[in-house]
Amino acid sequence: MNVFARSSVLAAEMIDVFDRTHTEKELVFQSKELCRDFIHSRITREGLSWSKVELDLPEPRGVLVDVSVVLLKLGDELECMRPYVYRNIAKQLNISVSVEAVVSDAFLSVATEVIAMGITWGKVVAIYAVAAGLAVDCVRLGHPVMVHTIVDSLGEFVRRSLVPWLKKRGGWVDILKCVVNMDSRAHVHWLSTAVLTWREFIKTMYVYLTK
Protein backbone atom coordinates (compact mmCIF):
# COMPACT_ATOMS: atom_id res chain seq x y z
CA MET A 1 0.00 0.00 0.00
CA ASN A 2 1.51 3.36 -1.04
CA VAL A 3 1.64 6.44 1.15
CA PHE A 4 -1.40 8.01 -0.50
CA ALA A 5 -3.48 4.88 0.00
CA ARG A 6 -2.41 4.64 3.64
CA SER A 7 -3.29 8.31 4.12
CA SER A 8 -6.73 7.71 2.65
CA VAL A 9 -7.33 4.74 4.95
CA LEU A 10 -6.16 6.74 7.98
CA ALA A 11 -8.42 9.64 7.03
CA ALA A 12 -11.36 7.27 6.64
CA GLU A 13 -10.65 5.73 10.05
CA MET A 14 -10.44 9.17 11.66
CA ILE A 15 -13.75 10.16 10.10
CA ASP A 16 -15.27 6.90 11.35
CA VAL A 17 -14.05 7.58 14.89
CA PHE A 18 -15.39 11.12 14.70
CA ASP A 19 -18.74 9.83 13.50
CA ARG A 20 -18.90 7.50 16.50
CA THR A 21 -18.35 10.38 18.92
CA HIS A 22 -21.60 10.85 20.79
CA THR A 23 -23.10 14.31 20.87
CA GLU A 24 -25.14 15.63 23.77
CA LYS A 25 -28.29 15.40 21.66
CA GLU A 26 -27.63 11.75 20.79
CA LEU A 27 -26.93 10.74 24.38
CA VAL A 28 -30.07 12.45 25.65
CA PHE A 29 -32.14 10.85 22.89
CA GLN A 30 -30.70 7.40 23.64
CA SER A 31 -31.23 7.85 27.37
CA LYS A 32 -34.89 8.70 26.83
CA GLU A 33 -35.37 5.71 24.52
CA LEU A 34 -33.86 3.44 27.15
CA CYS A 35 -36.11 5.02 29.76
CA ARG A 36 -39.21 4.33 27.66
CA ASP A 37 -38.19 0.69 27.31
CA PHE A 38 -37.45 0.38 31.03
CA ILE A 39 -40.77 1.98 32.00
CA HIS A 40 -42.73 -0.06 29.45
CA SER A 41 -41.21 -3.26 30.87
CA ARG A 42 -42.16 -2.35 34.44
CA ILE A 43 -45.67 -1.21 33.54
CA THR A 44 -46.27 -4.43 31.59
CA ARG A 45 -44.91 -6.48 34.48
CA GLU A 46 -47.51 -4.87 36.76
CA GLY A 47 -50.31 -5.85 34.39
CA LEU A 48 -50.92 -2.25 33.35
CA SER A 49 -50.80 -0.73 29.89
CA TRP A 50 -49.13 2.31 28.36
CA SER A 51 -48.02 2.95 24.80
CA LYS A 52 -44.41 4.08 24.43
CA VAL A 53 -44.94 4.74 20.74
CA GLU A 54 -44.70 8.44 19.90
CA LEU A 55 -44.71 10.18 16.54
CA ASP A 56 -41.34 10.32 14.78
CA LEU A 57 -39.62 8.28 17.50
CA PRO A 58 -38.08 5.09 16.04
CA GLU A 59 -37.65 1.95 18.09
CA PRO A 60 -34.17 1.31 19.56
CA ARG A 61 -31.92 -0.52 17.14
CA GLY A 62 -28.42 -1.89 16.87
CA VAL A 63 -26.31 -1.83 19.99
CA LEU A 64 -28.95 0.22 21.83
CA VAL A 65 -31.14 -2.89 21.88
CA ASP A 66 -28.37 -4.79 23.69
CA VAL A 67 -27.91 -1.88 26.08
CA SER A 68 -31.63 -1.91 26.88
CA VAL A 69 -31.54 -5.64 27.65
CA VAL A 70 -28.55 -5.21 29.98
CA LEU A 71 -30.08 -2.17 31.68
CA LEU A 72 -33.25 -4.15 32.37
CA LYS A 73 -31.28 -7.13 33.72
CA LEU A 74 -29.29 -4.92 36.05
CA GLY A 75 -32.53 -3.25 37.10
CA ASP A 76 -34.02 -6.66 37.90
CA GLU A 77 -31.02 -7.52 40.05
CA LEU A 78 -31.17 -4.22 41.91
CA GLU A 79 -34.92 -4.46 42.50
CA CYS A 80 -34.64 -8.05 43.72
CA MET A 81 -32.22 -6.93 46.42
CA ARG A 82 -34.67 -4.39 47.84
CA PRO A 83 -38.05 -4.96 46.15
CA TYR A 84 -39.96 -2.43 48.23
CA VAL A 85 -37.56 0.46 47.74
CA TYR A 86 -38.49 0.94 44.09
CA ARG A 87 -42.23 0.49 44.55
CA ASN A 88 -44.79 3.08 45.63
CA ILE A 89 -42.33 5.87 44.94
CA ALA A 90 -45.03 8.56 44.98
CA LYS A 91 -46.19 7.42 48.41
CA GLN A 92 -42.63 7.34 49.74
CA LEU A 93 -42.08 10.88 48.49
CA ASN A 94 -45.55 11.94 49.64
CA ILE A 95 -46.37 13.66 46.34
CA SER A 96 -49.40 13.96 44.10
CA VAL A 97 -48.84 12.54 40.62
CA SER A 98 -51.55 14.73 39.13
CA VAL A 99 -49.31 17.81 38.92
CA GLU A 100 -46.61 17.79 36.25
CA ALA A 101 -44.26 20.18 38.04
CA VAL A 102 -44.44 18.17 41.26
CA VAL A 103 -43.64 14.89 39.50
CA SER A 104 -40.77 16.43 37.55
CA ASP A 105 -39.26 18.26 40.53
CA ALA A 106 -39.49 15.19 42.76
CA PHE A 107 -37.76 12.96 40.23
CA LEU A 108 -35.02 15.48 39.50
CA SER A 109 -34.40 16.00 43.22
CA VAL A 110 -34.03 12.29 43.87
CA ALA A 111 -31.83 11.71 40.81
CA THR A 112 -29.57 14.62 41.71
CA GLU A 113 -29.12 13.42 45.29
CA VAL A 114 -28.35 9.86 44.16
CA ILE A 115 -25.26 11.02 42.24
CA ALA A 116 -24.26 13.72 44.71
CA MET A 117 -21.21 11.71 45.81
CA GLY A 118 -20.26 10.53 42.34
CA ILE A 119 -21.61 8.58 39.38
CA THR A 120 -21.51 4.81 38.88
CA TRP A 121 -23.48 2.48 36.64
CA GLY A 122 -25.18 1.17 39.77
CA LYS A 123 -26.49 4.64 40.54
CA VAL A 124 -27.58 5.19 36.94
CA VAL A 125 -29.56 1.94 37.03
CA ALA A 126 -31.09 3.02 40.35
CA ILE A 127 -32.24 6.28 38.78
CA TYR A 128 -33.93 4.35 35.96
CA ALA A 129 -35.58 2.10 38.54
CA VAL A 130 -36.90 5.17 40.37
CA ALA A 131 -38.23 6.62 37.10
CA ALA A 132 -39.98 3.35 36.29
CA GLY A 133 -41.40 2.98 39.79
CA LEU A 134 -42.78 6.51 39.68
CA ALA A 135 -44.19 5.89 36.19
CA VAL A 136 -45.99 2.77 37.41
CA ASP A 137 -47.55 4.86 40.19
CA CYS A 138 -48.70 7.46 37.67
CA VAL A 139 -50.38 4.88 35.44
CA ARG A 140 -51.93 3.01 38.34
CA LEU A 141 -53.34 6.25 39.80
CA GLY A 142 -54.90 7.29 36.51
CA HIS A 143 -52.32 9.77 35.22
CA PRO A 144 -50.55 7.95 32.36
CA VAL A 145 -49.70 11.24 30.66
CA MET A 146 -47.18 11.84 33.44
CA VAL A 147 -45.05 9.01 32.06
CA HIS A 148 -43.94 11.36 29.30
CA THR A 149 -43.13 13.98 31.93
CA ILE A 150 -40.88 11.48 33.69
CA VAL A 151 -39.13 10.52 30.45
CA ASP A 152 -38.56 14.18 29.59
CA SER A 153 -37.31 14.86 33.12
CA LEU A 154 -34.83 12.02 32.85
CA GLY A 155 -33.65 13.43 29.54
CA GLU A 156 -33.11 16.81 31.17
CA PHE A 157 -31.25 15.18 34.04
CA VAL A 158 -28.97 13.36 31.62
CA ARG A 159 -28.30 16.60 29.76
CA ARG A 160 -27.42 18.44 32.97
CA SER A 161 -25.53 15.79 34.86
CA LEU A 162 -24.64 12.64 32.92
CA VAL A 163 -23.55 13.66 29.42
CA PRO A 164 -19.86 14.33 30.29
CA TRP A 165 -19.68 11.07 32.26
CA LEU A 166 -21.25 9.09 29.42
CA LYS A 167 -18.92 10.66 26.86
CA LYS A 168 -15.86 9.63 28.85
CA ARG A 169 -17.06 6.04 28.71
CA GLY A 170 -17.83 6.04 25.02
CA GLY A 171 -21.57 6.22 25.52
CA TRP A 172 -24.12 3.73 26.79
CA VAL A 173 -22.25 0.78 25.29
CA ASP A 174 -19.96 0.86 28.35
CA ILE A 175 -22.73 -0.61 30.49
CA LEU A 176 -22.36 -3.89 28.60
CA LYS A 177 -19.16 -4.46 30.56
CA CYS A 178 -21.25 -4.91 33.69
CA VAL A 179 -22.49 -8.33 32.55
CA VAL A 180 -20.23 -9.53 29.74
CA ASN A 181 -17.67 -12.06 31.01
CA MET A 182 -18.65 -11.22 34.57
CA ASP A 183 -16.38 -13.06 37.00
CA SER A 184 -17.00 -13.47 40.72
CA ARG A 185 -15.09 -10.33 41.66
CA ALA A 186 -17.02 -8.23 39.14
CA HIS A 187 -20.27 -9.68 40.44
CA VAL A 188 -19.36 -8.77 44.02
CA HIS A 189 -18.42 -5.27 42.84
CA TRP A 190 -21.79 -4.83 41.14
CA LEU A 191 -23.66 -6.01 44.24
CA SER A 192 -21.68 -3.76 46.55
CA THR A 193 -22.34 -0.82 44.24
CA ALA A 194 -26.04 -1.64 44.20
CA VAL A 195 -26.21 -1.84 48.00
CA LEU A 196 -24.46 1.51 48.28
CA THR A 197 -26.94 2.96 45.79
CA TRP A 198 -29.83 1.62 47.86
CA ARG A 199 -28.48 3.22 51.02
CA GLU A 200 -28.05 6.55 49.26
CA PHE A 201 -31.54 6.26 47.79
CA ILE A 202 -33.05 5.81 51.25
CA LYS A 203 -31.08 8.84 52.42
CA THR A 204 -32.35 10.76 49.40
CA MET A 205 -35.95 9.92 50.27
CA TYR A 206 -35.34 11.28 53.77
CA VAL A 207 -33.73 14.46 52.44
CA TYR A 208 -36.62 15.08 50.05
CA LEU A 209 -39.28 14.50 52.68
CA THR A 210 -37.61 16.78 55.22
CA LYS A 211 -37.00 19.77 52.92
Swiss-Prot record:
Biological role stated in the UniProt entry: May play a role in apoptosis. Does not appear to show pro-apoptotic activity when expressed ectopically in early embryos.
Locus of motif BH2: 165-179
This protein's name: Bcl-2-related ovarian killer protein homolog B
Motif annotated as BH3, chain positions: 67-83
InterPro entries attached to this UniProt entry: Bcl-2-like_sf, Bcl-2_BH1-3, Bcl-2_fam, Bcl2-like, Bcl2_BH4
Topology of this chain in the membrane: Single-pass membrane protein
Organism field: Danio rerio
Assigned protein family: Belongs to the Bcl-2 family.
Cellular location(s): Membrane
Biological process terms in GO annotation: apoptotic process; regulation of apoptotic process
Keyword Transmembrane helix: yes
GO cellular component, one term: mitochondrial outer membrane
Keywords from the named record: Apoptosis, Membrane, Transmembrane, Transmembrane helix
Chain span(s) of sequence motif BH4: 32-44
